[in-house]
Amino acid sequence: MRNLNIYNIRKWYKMLAGTSILHVNQGVGKIYSKNDIGGYYNDLTEKVLRGKNLQKVKIPRLQLKNGQEVVFPIAVFQYGLGAYDLYLIEKKEIYINKFKLTADWALANQEENGAWNNFFFNNPEAPFSAMAQGEGASLLIRAYKQLGMIEYLEAAEKAIEFMIMPVGDGGTTLLRAGAHVVDEG
């Protein structure tokens, strides 16, 4: 019963009613290809289309149960990947602008070691996530391909290096039964 509070009830209602931007259908990407870096393999376009700010170019924010708004890196990366797919499909300038904004945010907010501080608001002792690292790298590789700035590629490489670094060294990879497993934090 600890999780039963007005914040979670609202969150669950939005999820069940199909109005949550955090919980959208994520089938196979609409223009995903195994042969080319283009569309993302998950369909994240609803992350962009369902948002309140469809006609605005701004970084998405997450509202915490205490009412505070934070920028959650995974949400930014998924929004950017969805915007890029929409740009590839529709060729609308608004989508490439949203995509570029998220890629620039990723550059500006990446730590020196290649990480993004993903769970700073609820788990500051273990704020890193392999999911954030992978999605951030995916966003930045597409930004490099589309926009040509070498800084995007360099940041993607740093993100992957951090993702495969062992947890004991600060990264997000665990060794279990001789296999490397990426950790969600």
Name each model-derived stretch.
Residues 1-185:
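Glycan-recognition and catalytic cores of secretory/periplasmic carbohydrate-active enzymes
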